[in-house]
Amino acid sequence: MQQKLSGRNLLLVGFTLFSMFFGAGNLIFPPHLGAQAGTNLWPAFAGLSVSAIGLPIAGVVAVARAGDLDKLASRVHPLFAPVFTVLVYLSIGPCLAIPRTASTSFQMLVPLVGGGAGLQLVYSVLFFTAAFCVALHPDKLTDLLGRILCPCLIGLIVVLFAGCLAHPLTAHYTAPSAEYASLPAAQGILYGYQTMDTLAGLNFGAVIALNIRARGITEGPAVERGTIRAGFIAGGLLLAVYAMLVHAGAQTGAVHPGLATGAEVLTALAQDLFGWAGLVLVAAIFVIACFNTCVGLIA
């Protein structure tokens, strides 16, 4: 009898993969792109989707079909595999992506709790300790990320987007900035790559395979099929959430021109819509998203 994930378990695994992908960069870049692209928003969004969704999901599929990252890289050359694998793990791990999860989420808490090096150190220690404890059991990530944190994260983003639809800041997008005035799709591709999800996808495929095996699916082809399908679910969720964020960013950019980062764009939007509660909303979104990604990268 052919092994197959149930629809419910497949959805949970897809939610887990989405949670692992959707971190600091995924929150920052789409709204800033929307604010900068203005009336050229949708061509730029198409480019962003190629590099921030298409390539990462392709990485998950490639690793699923090969078995693991080392086997995939060995197709280039046996000596290339260990070097490439180490560089990928370093770049998405301790060198760049993991430290960014704590620093970015803390910055969103500063307006609520204040700043200071001591407070940031305490927060970082607690943040990484909690993430490490969860990541010790990579085969059980679906129980926390897929069942609890991912629905909470999506729900909070939907609340922000619903507020943007119910009380739009403006009826029109602004003119695009100079870099998006021509070839906005190409600029979107370059911008989307900065999420670093293309590299992360090469690592996450193996983690998702572990979660599928933990649900009783042990046959290689069945694990491969489940991983690929979970990748498409995660890609669909990313597409929907990015569309919300770029639209919200475009509206905010028209009212608040010159905002330097996506974090500033989201903060301005949330504060305009919900006041002080908006700051709490955005901080919660960033903390959950960054925690999910940190767990995935450590695992």
Feature roles, as predicted:
Residues L10-L48, A58-A62, A66-L72, I208, ...:
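Transmembrane helix-boundary motif of multi-pass solute transporters/channels
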Residues K4-R8, G34-G59, R75-F84, L119-Q120, ...:
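Extracellular loop-to-transmembrane helix junctions
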Residues V63-K71, F128-L149, A214-I217:
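Membrane-water interface regions at transmembrane-helix termini and the short interhelical loops
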